[in-house]
């Protein structure tokens, strides 16, 4: 992801806590500058970046409000935060405790909006990410959810079967539908698989 962003951005700085990941990025992706550190206290100056991109990470963090406050600190006025996270309503229906053992807290759209606004962001758009027709077919092949099939293997520390590996490798961007949460929308954001928020630092 960071390397794709580097193809259109003047400078990309990635941050990761894991030393092996930092070394991997340094050796494999020369266009990406990578820092070892805590996402809740990034070693960059105040108001030093134009965009913070954070996809599928916040659900793994223990102090989500602090992380979002840190994103606000890093952004210049008018800068944007792009954030995605699994939708708690579809990932862990009927419970506040995540099914995925690697998640600390999952959010629904209202909770994500509240976290962003409480930190001082203005939410520009809240979107739901839905499976398109090809992914719906893959879900059916894997017992109703290709995501649940992956989680089950991870929890069991079991290898992925060849058909699951092949299907995951075959997923393309165009297999997803991103639908804004606006009045009259064809989709209910509470039915989405993931949430995609774009928020602005005033």
Which residues are covered by each model-predicted region?
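Conserved SAM-binding loop
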Residues: 1-94, 108-113, 197-199
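Hydrophobic anchor at the start of a short beta-strand
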Residues: 12, 123-124
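Charged, low-complexity surface patches
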Residues: 14, 105, 188
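Phosphate/oxyanion-binding loops and surfaces in catalytic or ligand/nucleic-acid-binding neighborhoods
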Residues: 88, 118-123, 132-133
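A short secondary-structure junction signal
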Residues: 95-96, 137
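Short glycine-enriched, charge-decorated loop/helix-capping segments at active-site entrances
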Residues: 97-102
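Short alpha-helix
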Residues: 104-120, 126
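A C-terminal cap/extension of S-adenosyl-L-methionine-dependent methyltransferases
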Residues: 125-202
């Amino acid at each position: 992801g960071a390397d794709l962003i580097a193809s259109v951005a003047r400078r990309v700085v990635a941050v990761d806590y894991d030393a092996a990941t930092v070394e991997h990025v340094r050796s494999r992706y020369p266009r990406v500058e990578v820092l070892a550190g805590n996402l809740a206290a990034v070693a960059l100056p105040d108001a030093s970046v134009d965009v913070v991109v954070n996809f599928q990470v916040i659900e793994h963090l223990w102090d989500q409000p602090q992380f979002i406050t840190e994103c606000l600190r890093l952004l210049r006025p008018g800068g944007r935060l792009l954030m995605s996270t699994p939708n708690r309503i579809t990932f862990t229906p009927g419970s506040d405790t995540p099914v995925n053992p690697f998640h600390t807290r999952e959010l629904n759209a209202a909770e994500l909006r509240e976290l962003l606004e409480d930190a001082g962001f203005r939410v520009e758009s809240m979107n739901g990410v839905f499976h398109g027709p090809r992914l719906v077919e893959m879900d059916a092949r894997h017992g109703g959810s290709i995501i649940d099939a992956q989680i089950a293997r991870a929890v069991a520390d079991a290898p992925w079967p060849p058909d699951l590996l092949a299907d995951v490798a075959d997923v393309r961007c165009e297999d997803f539908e991103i639908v804004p949460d606006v009045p009259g929308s064809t989709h209910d954001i509470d039915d989405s698989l993931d949430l995609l928020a774009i928020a602005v630092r005033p």
